[in-house]
Every structure is written in C-alpha cells, then in structure tokens.
Amino acid sequence: MDYKETLNLPSTEFSMRANLVKKEPEMIKKWHEMDDYNLILKSREGKPKFVLHDGPPYANGNIHIGTATNKILKDIVIRYKTMRGYYAPYVPGWDTHGLPIEHRVSVEMGEKIKGMSPVEIRQKCKEFALHFVDVQREQFKRLGVRGDWDNPYLTLDPKYEKHILNIFKTLVKNGNVYRGNKPVYWCPTCKTALAEAEVEYHDHSSPSIYVKFELEKNTYIVIWTTTPWTLPANVAIAVHPEYDYVKIKVGNEYWIVAEGLLNKFAAETEIEYSVVEKFKGKDLEHKKAKHPFMNRESLIVLADYVTLEDGTGCVHTAPGHGAEDYLTGIKYNLPVLSPVNEEGVFTKDAGKYAGLKIWDANKVIIEDLEKLGVLIKSQKIEHSYPHCWRCKNPVIFRATPQWFISVDRNGLREKVLEEIKKVEWHPKWGENRITAMVKERPDWTISRQRVWGTPIPAIKCKECGEVFLDEKVIDNFVNIVEEKGTDAWFELSEDELIPEGVKCPKCGKNSFEKTYDTLDVWIDSGCSFEAVIRSKGEKFPVDLYLEGDDQHRGWFQSSIFMSVAHTNIAPYKSVVTHGFIKDEHGRKMSKSLGNVIDPKEIVDKYGADILRLWVSSIDFFDNIRVGKNIIQQQVETYKKLRNTLRYLLGNLNDFEENMIVPFEKLLPLDKWALGRLQEVISQVTEHFEKYEYSKVYSLLNRYCTVELSATYLDIIKDRIYVEAKGSIYRRSAQTVMYYILQSLIKMLAPILVFTAEEAYQLSPFKKYETVHLEYWPEVKEEYIDNQIMEDFKMILLIRDDVLKALEEARKQDIIGHSLDAKVTIEGLNDNVQMIIEKHKDYLSEIFIVSDVEIGNGQTKGEFVSVTVEKAKGEKCQRCWKYSEDVGKDDTYKDVCPRCAAVLKGERK
C-alpha cells in the first residue's frame, strides 16, 4: 500500500520561487488603492507620537545606492515604531534649490542661457527639480518605502520659503548676519562662493616650490607654497613665536628656516649648509622682506598656526586667499589683496599676470621666480585639495564681499555646543565629531552669486553704495513670498519690494536698488524643522534625524544652528548616522572603476526585498560595502528565510486559532520552542530599539536556518506528517509553529515588507487588511518555563554529541538515514544523566532515530558516551522508523503500531 496519501503533507500557495520582481509592483498598487499610509496612521491615532524628520535628498538625478540605503533605513525605523504602537508619520522632502540644479540646467541650455533672464533661468531650474522629485518619488516607492508621498515638503514651495526668510530675519535681528570682505571658498567654474559643506576633498597635483624673500642684503627668509598663483597677493610671512629658527649659510648667502624643518628642507633642496645663528621666531616680528616680484614689502608676523610638518616654518601669507591669513591680516592691519576675478582670472592688480587664468599663471610665476634667482626648488606633489561639490573642479580661496552668519555673536556657538550634549548620538562618536567641527568652524558664508535659490533681500544705496539688510524689507518680502513665491524678488520693482520709510544706515538717503545674491542651500534645508515640523504643530524637537555621517558638517549642523538661533533648542532628540557606501573591496565607487552598484538594477533583477535585506545586514554605523557577490549572498539568505516561512505556512494549512493547545498541555519540546521564541522576540526587539539591524538580521537568519529548519522543525517533522491530524502530538507542534510564524512575519515586516505581506495574506492569523497594520509581538513570560529551558539547553548539546556519532556511523556504512539507527547513551556526569532519564520518552524524536537506550556508550562526546548500531526490527513503510513490532497489526501488516493506530483513527 502507498501510504503517502495518509500523511499530513504541507500545502500552501506561498511558492518556493519568490518572483518578487512581478509581485512587488502589484503589492505597491494594492497598498496605494487602500491608501495604506493614512489607513495605518489612522489606526494609531491617539497613540504616543514618534517623529523621524526626513533629511531632503537633492532633486537632481536618479537615486543611487546611498540614497536608497538611507530611505530604506528610515522606512525600517518608521515601520517598526508603527508596529510598536506609535503614531509615526513620515513626510519625505526634497532639497530643490542651489548650484547643482542650476549647473545642470546651464549645461543643458548651453549658449542659450546667456540670453535668459534670471526669472527664465529660475523657471527652468524649477521644472528640472520638480521632474526629478517625481522620478525619485517613484523610485523610493518602488523600494517599498511608505510615506506621505502625495504631500512631500519641497524647499522651493513658497510656504517653505516663507519660513526660511522668517528664520533669516531672526538671525538679522539678533545681529548674527553681517557683510564682510573675507576670503571664502570660491569655485571659478561655477562662479560662486561655497560653504565648507559644499567642498569635497580629492587628490590633486600641485606645484611645490621653495622661494626666498630678501630680508636684508644677502640674507633671505625662505617660504614654501603649493599655490604659486597666490604670491602676487603676498603681504606677509608668518613665523611661530616660540619655535627655534636658524640662519644657515648656503654658498655666499644666508637663509632663514625653522630648525625643526632644517633636515627635511636640506634633503629636499639638496643643499650644503652650515648653521651660523639661532633665535626664536618672535625675534623676527615686524622685520620686512622684499617681495620677489611685486614692488612692495612683506611684513614678518607671528602666528600660532605655523607648524613643523612641511615647508620651512616660514609661511607665505596672503590675507585675500586664506582664512588664517585673513585673521593674521586683521591682527597686523595688512591689506586684503585678491587680484582674481570670479572666473579665476587675474585682474590688473596682479600686474604683468593680468588676464592669465590662475592655474596657467602657476607655470609663468615659477619661470619668473627662476629668472629672478629666488626659486630654490620646484617639484610636483600629490595631495588632498578642495573641489567644488557640483562641478568637481578645484576651488580657491578668494576675498569677496559676502554675507556671513557670525557663529559666535550672542553666544550662538556655545549654545549649540550645549545642545549637542543633550542629544543622543548613534554611534556615540558622532557627538565628538560634530562637537569638534562646531568648535573649529569659521563664520558661515551664506551668500551665493547664483539665481536659483532663496534671494537674500538685501538692498544697495544708490548714493553711497552701502549694501544692507532691513527688517522692514524682509517682512514685506515674506508677505509677498507667501502669495507669489521668491521669483517676486526678481520680477518686482524696488518700489514694490521696499516699503516707505527705509533709509540707508550709512548716509540716510532713500534711493535703493536690489542685490541678487541667494542663500546657501544649507540654510534652506536647515530651516526644515520650522517649515515642516514646528509650524505645523508637530512634535518638537523631533525624535530622530537619520542621515549619512557626512551630515555632521552638513544638515545636522545647519539644522542645529538654525534651530538654536530661532528656538534656543536642538531640533532633534536623537541622531543616527550611517557610513559611506563602498564596493566589496572597500574602494570608493566610481564609473571609471566600473564598481558602481545601481539600486534599480538590483530591484529589477531580484526585487526590492533583496535590497532591503542587504540594508538590514550591514553594520551601517561604519563604512558599508556592497557588490554583486554580497547581493548574491543576500539572495541565498532570502531563500532560506522564505523556505522557513513556506514550511511553516504549508504545515499550518489545516490549523486555525481555535485549535491552539494551552501552554500547560504542550509537549516538553514544544514548550522549549515556545520559550525560545520569547527569547528571540526579546533580543530582536532590543536590537531594533538600538538601530542594530545587522544583529536583527544575524539573529533571525540563525534562528530560521539553525534553530528552526535544522533543529526544531526537523525534529517535529515526524509528528507533523505522521501523527493523526487532530492529535495532541500534532496540534501541540502546530500551536508553536503558529506562534513562530506569527512572530516571524511581524519581526520581518519592517525589513521584508513585500514578503511579510505575501506570507501574512496566506496565514491562519490574518485579521487586518495588511500586515503593516499589525502590532509587534510581545514577550509572554508565562511561555518561559525556566526548568524546561535549562533542560533543553543540555538536551540540544547532547544531541550534538549524538549527531556526530551518527555521522561517523554513516561514514562506516553502519547506517544510511538516521532512522536506521539505535542509539545507546549515558551521561558523563550525574546532571546530564538525570536530564536523560527525565526526558527519555522524547529522545528518539529529538535525535531523529528509531530507538534510544540508556546505557554505556562506546564513543565519548562532550556530554555523553554514545554507541550507534543498526536498529532492530523492520522498517515501517509509513514513518520509516524501525520497530520489532512492525507487522503485528492484522489490518496494516507493514507499519508500526503507532502508524496502525493513526490509520485506524485510534490515536488521539
């Protein structure tokens, strides 16, 4: 007789093949039709709020692996918090102003842009930004990210711009905004000032030259520079007051350098010398050297920032081309020379170099220095150099009139530092990082010489040329913006923009013209706490900001400065950061290396759940690695998780909630499995709370593959398949499988949003329209029997000893399948022996063998001695266990008594 039809074989529509690429878009459509975002929020009305505020990605292209990772991490947080019972809204946003967009539009428009008005350029920029908002929105939705996609916040929205200007007015009112002629980062390609956060460092080849300035007849002070083009602006040479300096004789000349750099300098320049004098740097103060090619003198000044790392300890100083140089210039009342125009071309003030591009001038200046006999050494060096974040070209320091935020006025910096201490930083080193940055940061350059941005409503007096900010002008403009947007600044006349009664603070006249600088985009996004959260009555400060760790100098910093200036408190309670994404070998991704991973390719090939699983697998607090092999590993892990879900669903096809067996009636093994589930829920919950998703991933992966598939589910397979459908033996195991499946689906739901939904819809416990309306599994202490947990901890260790012995017997051809075996075991100590005796009735099931005898074993394991031999009797044709009682039943001659009783309906 074929007994296959008498077995309780698994059956489910949850297929082994995931087919995520086809199924996921169908689920997204279904969620959209049910309005899942609002449906889920409504279900949590009146509950405690959890607000994660979205840092806006830039709307200037397709999403990349970094933005995809960031959005998935945020989605995991929101979904988990929602399941924990929080009212957790998620309003996505986009950064839509600024240079990157204007640059792209300029490239697309080509020569046409020269004939376009500012308003026309702004309109093109707006269209470009809104197009990519739509593109990115669909791409994020395809990743399974849930949010208020129909109502995102956009920094170009007039309602948003109004709040930018109101916060700007607060800064003006508090005296934190000033105009100054200071050296700032300047991009000659994009022709605009840049803030520190808009500068990236890349390797760059620069000239490295040693030049001598004549101090007195036949005596020279030697400087070193990697920017020869700044020499026309040199007005001083800085030395350290406390360093020792030496006068050395080289040929018939005397040169001055720092003693601490003498050996390095001599080796690089290949000179022979003798030391003739030694003195402190402060002894050189106020002496004057002759500029090598400009008709002026260079003052010797003192500066503590001079180091003994490179060069000569005598630092070329041009206040118009360096932040430290500028401060030294103020101290010594030096002129701020910057003979370079917005395109990086020398002006007439550079003398013979006028009209030359600065990078081309390097070569000419070096040649001239050589002709003048003052060039000691010239070579090339590779070093890290600042580049524009948008065009990727090198930037310069250039003194120009700009608007700045003073970070020290009114104690702003100190207040920010105090607020940083109150924030919870994940990882903890984030606090040290942002603290160091805030302590060291210079005043903030906030003006940009571009049209696509929030205009700075500054006006210029036609009579005396004074450029200033007036609160009445700002107030009037705020009212106009709410109705007409910031284009109004470019469209309306001065009479419409400037209210009556405004007078020039310098000369008292009232004839003005507009200026056209726009605000740094970091001001835009830094004001989101007000525009998106506080002004709408949302919870403030918010619970969480979650971004890449580059935002310590970007959005985290701009937000806390704006918030403290406007509200006196930090805008966030907690900050979580993730690292940069690199390839499998830890290299930066680049098109030239061919190692760029496109999230769209992963989603199109494997499905979004695979990408989401990868995101959960990474220890994202550190730098993150991804590549084809790593993604393939996630595909394999996913298959194991899916197969576990499928097995559980398949074996619960005839099980309903009313069939649940009370805990006290469960079999001991099932009690252990249910208790272990509580431990897993507790550990997973703890990891979610700490944003340690890689630990969630590892724990659930091990739980499914080792503890369930290879252990518990393998052990109970006999009971599930062979025992009577409604028997206590089967229902006891099914009860625990029910709880495991229910909890597993819920714990996977924030990560595998699509797979969890698919499994939930086919589960016996479905009670909501979507799994994402479900609540997080709770730890039930009453399901933890401490004695059972302790006993089975040992039993599973004993099982490991037995499995090793079975494997050895298999190699020796004593057995084939483990059910061919009879095992004899004995504990190696009294405690082990006691546990064996106590649970002897279940040991054959746990070891998956036909018979277990307690007695002296031949092979010593760690906890028991084991003997494996061929089981006695015949093989039952239904359960495959060996028994000496096979054939004793008159009706079923080839099965064991247990199977005969099942077939007759006698086993309950």
Curated annotation (Swiss-Prot):
Pfam families for the chain: Anticodon_1, tRNA-synt_1, zf-FPG_IleRS
Binding of ATP, residues: 591
Gene3D superfamilies referenced in this protein's UniProt entry, alphabetically: 1.10.730.20, HUPs, Ile-tRNA synthetase CP2 domain-like, Valyl/Leucyl/Isoleucyl-tRNA synthetase, editing domain
GO molecular function: aminoacyl-tRNA deacylase activity; ATP binding; isoleucine-tRNA ligase activity; tRNA binding; zinc ion binding
Binding site for Zn(2+): 876, 879, 896, 899
EC number(s) reported in the record: 6.1.1.5
Residue span of motif 'HIGH' region: 57-67
UniProt KW Chloroplast keyword: no
Keywords (A to Z) from UniProt: Aminoacyl-tRNA synthetase, ATP-binding, Cytoplasm, Ligase, Metal-binding, Nucleotide-binding, Protein biosynthesis, Zinc
Function per UniProt: Catalyzes the attachment of isoleucine to tRNA(Ile). As IleRS can inadvertently accommodate and process structurally similar amino acids such as valine, to avoid such errors it has two additional distinct tRNA(Ile)-dependent editing activities. One activity is designated as 'pretransfer' editing and involves the hydrolysis of activated Val-AMP. The other activity is designated 'posttransfer' editing and involves deacylation of mischarged Val-tRNA(Ile).
Free-text note on domains in this protein's UniProt record: IleRS has two distinct active sites: one for aminoacylation and one for editing. The misactivated valine is translocated from the active site to the editing site, which sterically excludes the correctly activated isoleucine. The single editing site contains two valyl binding pockets, one specific for each substrate (Val-AMP or Val-tRNA(Ile)).
Name of protein: Isoleucine--tRNA ligase
Lineage per the UniProt record: Bacteria, Thermotogati, Thermotogota, Thermotogae, Thermotogales
